[in-house]
Swiss-Prot record:
Name of this protein: Spore coat protein SA
Extent of the signal sequence: none
EC number(s) on file: 2.4.-.-
Keywords assigned: Glycosyltransferase, Sporulation, Transferase
Keyword Glycosyltransferase tagged: yes
Alphabetized InterPro entries for the sequence: Glyco_trans_1 (IPR001296), Glyco_trans_4-like_N (IPR028098)
GO molecular function ontology, one term from the record: glycosyltransferase activity
GO BP annotation list: biosynthetic process; sporulation resulting in formation of a cellular spore
Domain of life (superkingdom): Bacteria
One Pfam family cited in the UniProt record for this chain: Glycos_transf_1
EC top class named in words: transferase
Family affiliation: Belongs to the glycosyltransferase group 1 family. Glycosyltransferase 4 subfamily.
Keyword Oxidoreductase on entry: no
Length: 377
């Protein structure tokens, strides 16, 4: 098959500037290209050639202005068998006109079928135009089918994934080495490390973890809570909320570390140095990719019962779900429980890693997408 993968207009692929969708496409495209001819369309970037072939994948970079129109022209010219559009349902009918003989697949990574994103008529036309809608979580699928019942027979969850080769759990030789190196660099030897990775914004709930900290310190005076991220990744300018977090952190300054934007290649070592991973998200999140990263690193996970996040947690096996997600004491209780038992942390962490290896490696994601493509072709 001749397959087109269409990124959004936000960031380029390969993912030289980050982005969940861009990371996703860069990971799965070479694996799909082992069986099919694959072209990835995304916006231009000064660090990327306009057209190049890497790992068997054709990359075409188009002007950000009028990007959708430029993609349509490419589809019309190249005659693809299957077109996979990422996260832009409103584009599908227009692109379909340029490639009427192609099968269209839509992947939905956020609440793109919400009332403020797409009209009823546009949504129905999009659903009629695609053979299948793949979503990153059951939660996102439900946001579509609850409003558009006609999508039920077409909607399927295909979870995202993680590069298993870059994450080394602490019980491996490489993981032990990375753990010691990172702890040494940050001066954290002998600490029990609780890790938060994400944007420092109220909807992500880092303030709740800081409010939970006194109860944790009481039981574990050797705890260190590490926050990785800024207001937005790559933006280290302080806003009022981040200043508030720093004020809260200063009250327990010997137990809190803020690490602003780090290079993606350094992220795995920061997971490996940690003992417990916590996602305190307060909004209905599609399914934060930090969960896959924590599993790959072999960490026990504590996550809030919001959006798709609980879908990858088996209660008591690879982590715990906080149902009273606004309550700092609930987080403190679960964190204390895990910090009190290295045996439990290791048991849950090993289950996490096995889950990642079985279900959330990029090879599995690519296989799941291929089954969708081949079924609909």
């Amino acid at each position: 098959m001749k397959i087109a993968l269409i990124a959004t207009e936000k960031l380029p692929v390969p993912s030289v500037r980050g982005g969940a969708i861009q990371i996703y496409l860069e990971a799965v495209a070479p694996l799909i290209a082992k069986k099919h001819e694959v072209t990835v369309f995304s916006i231009k970037d000064p660090n990327l050639a306009d057209r190049e072939k890497v790992d068997g994948v054709h990359y075409v970079h188009l002007d950000e202005d009028r990007y959708e129109e430029a993609v349509g022209a490419e589809l019309k010219k190249s005659r693809f068998d299957l077109v996979h559009v990422c996260n832009r349902p409103s584009w599908v009918p227009k692109l379909k006109k340029q490639a009427p003989d192609a099968v269209f697949i839509l992947s939905v990574h956020n609440e793109m079928f919400a009332y403020d994103k797409i009209s009823q008529a546009e949504g129905e036309i999009c659903i009629d135009s695609v053979a299948q809608i793949v979503t990153v979580s059951d939660y996102i699928g439900q946001t579509i089918t609850s409003r558009f019942p006609s999508a039920r027979s077409k909607t399927k969850t295909v979870y995202s994934g993680v590069d298993l080769k870059t994450y080394h759990p602490r019980w491996t030789n490489e993981g032990q080495r990375a753990r010691e190196e990172m702890r040494s660099e940050l001066g954290l030897h002998g600490k029990k490390i609780v890790l938060f990775v994400g944007r420092l914004s109220k909807v992500k709930g880092p303030h709740i973890l800081l409010q939970a900290l006194p109860d944790i310190i009481e039981e574990h005076p050797d705890v260190m809570m590490v926050f990785i991220g800024s207001k937005w990744f790559g933006d280290n300018e302080l806003n009022n909320y981040v200043k508030h977090l720093h004020t809260l952190g200063a009250m327990q300054k010997d137990h809190v570390t803020f690490i602003q934007f780090v290079k993606p290649k350094d992220i795995p070592r920061l997971y490996t140095m940690s003992d417990v991973f916590v996602c305190s998200s307060q909004w209905q999140e599609p399914l934060a990719r930090v969960h896959y990263e924590a599993m790959a690193a072999g960490l026990p996970i504590i996550t809030s019962n919001r959006g798709g996040n609980p879908e990858v947690i088996e209660e008591g096996k690879n982590g715990y779900i906080i149902h009273d997600f606004e309550n700092p004491k609930q987080y403190a209780e679960r964190i204390n429980d895990l910090l009190s038992s290295s045996e439990k942390r290791e048991r849950l962490g090993k289950y996490s890693r096995r889950e990642a290896e079985s279900n959330f490696g990029w090879q599995r994601v690519a296989e799941n997408l291929l089954s969708v493509y081949e079924k609909n072709r």
